């Protein structure tokens, strides 16, 4: 009924469409995994049910809340309404400090305690790496 050229054209278009759909799917999956979405301590406190999935908690490191004990770091993240205690094992980023923004990735023990597996320190829009600042200062 249809000629050989029409069948080949249909197969070619079907393969292109399948490739485009697969590419879009893979890009969206990649973006979903890399988007840095986090919940504030207030959002954590308002949770009805705690799940066992890995989540991110973000806010400011409360002043005078950092306690370093050998390989563990304990600190408090606040959104100035509520607070959550964080326990992290490992080295913290260079930008990690009291009064600075931070995102902790890990698991909730309960609505007040969080075990972090990764710490991401945030910086403001004026941040400049020391090497760049030094290079610009010389000129």
Curated annotation (Swiss-Prot):
Top-rank lineage group of the source organism: Bacteria
Biological processes per GO annotation: cytochrome complex assembly
Cellular localisation: Cell inner membrane
Transmembrane segments: 10-30
Topology relative to the membrane: Single-pass type II membrane protein
Keyword annotations: Cell inner membrane, Cell membrane, Cytochrome c-type biogenesis, Heme, Iron, Membrane, Metal-binding, Signal-anchor, Transmembrane, Transmembrane helix
GO molecular function, one term: metal ion binding
Principal location: membrane
Residues given in the record as heme binding sites: 123, 127
Signal peptide: none
GO cellular component terms attached to this protein's record: plasma membrane
Cytoplasmic side: 1-9
Periplasmic side: 31-139
Database matches in HAMAP family: CcmE (MF_01959)
PANTHER family: CYTOCHROME C-TYPE BIOGENESIS PROTEIN CCME HOMOLOG, MITOCHONDRIAL
Family, per entry: Belongs to the CcmE/CycJ family.
Function: Heme chaperone required for the biogenesis of c-type cytochromes. Transiently binds heme delivered by CcmC and transfers the heme to apo-cytochromes in a process facilitated by CcmF and CcmH.
Name assigned to this protein: Cytochrome c-type biogenesis protein CcmE
Annotated source species: Pelagibacter ubique (strain HTCC1062)
Lineage, highest ranks first: Bacteria, Pseudomonadati, Pseudomonadota, Alphaproteobacteria, Candidatus Pelagibacterales
